[in-house]
Regions:
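FIC/Doc superfamily catalytic core
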Residues: 1-247
Length: 247
């Protein structure tokens, strides 16, 4: 009996995309904990460094330092498309950057921010702009994995050169909220009346930058709008261990 293993290029791409979509689900709890602990110490080291350059290379370098020896692709731009099922979107995915356009899109966002002037802006306007910038940068998802942690570290270091006393404390306490806020800033479904919004990210930033005490509950971000105060508060269920270190 002869079996044919010939598949089309499109079928091969679909298999590869499916692999990268599901790979994280196959990690054991011990593997996840080991990864988180290693990355946590590297985040602490990175945020203790005084050197920083606002550039694409700096962002890529942070990813490499955080995930060297953990991910084979550490510091490498992905060359495949990805999807990620999001709880906050009822299983839908954000449309991440196309693999063929990642470098160009990435560099464009950096050039736009580098040439932007914060002069004469109110604090509300500054926070809104920062929310738009960081959500756009995250949406590109230039790496296969580790984008949110890399974005958070880069963002903290960038905020510091802008004069803010940013620490990782709020990220440690609200890591899942931060990610869900980034997701909501990049998802639109007109048929369901859902529009991308930075409002949740701005609330997060107001706590971070202005020391406000706004409540950050993941249930408030869910697109169904059905999760209310009477249901279990899952706000801190998935706290990212990688941010459980203070600076």
């Amino acid at each position: 009996m002869v079996f044919s293993f010939l598949i089309t290029i499109q079928e091969a791409k679909s298999l590869i995309d499916s692999y990268y979509e599901e790979r994280l689900d196959h990690m054991s709890d011990d593997e996840r904990i080991e990864e988180a602990d290693k990355v946590s110490s590297r985040i602490a080291e990175s945020l203790s460094e005084r050197a920083f350059s606002f550039s694409p290379n700096e962002y890529i370098s942070i990813h490499r330092k955080l995930f060297q020896g953990i991910y084979k692709h550490a510091g490498n731009i992905r060359d495949y498309n990805i999807t990620k099922k999001e709880w906050v979107l009822d299983g839908a995915t954000v449309m991440y950057g196309s693999a063929s356009e990642l470098r160009a899109t990435f560099e464009y966002d950096f050039s736009q921010e580098k040439n932007f002037s914060y002069k004469y802006l109110s604090m509300d306007e500054i926070i809104h702009h920062l929310a738009v910038f960081i959500s756009n940068l995250w949406q590109i998802h230039i790496f296969g994995e580790g984008n949110t942690r890399t974005t958070a570290v880069f963002f903290i270091k960038y905020l510091r050169i802008l004069g803010f006393s940013a620490t990782n404390d709020i990220f440690a306490e609200n890591a899942w909220y931060f990610r869900n806020a980034l997701v909501r800033a990049n998802y639109t479904n007109l048929q369901k009346g859902i529009h991308e919004t930075t409002e949740y990210l701005e609330v997060f930033l107001r706590n971070l930058l202005l020391n406000e005490k706004n409540e950050l509950h993941n249930r408030n971000l869910h697109i169904s709008g059905l999760l209310n105060e009477e249901k279990v508060d899952i706000g801190n269920v998935k706290v990212d261990r990688c941010f459980q270190t203070s600076f």
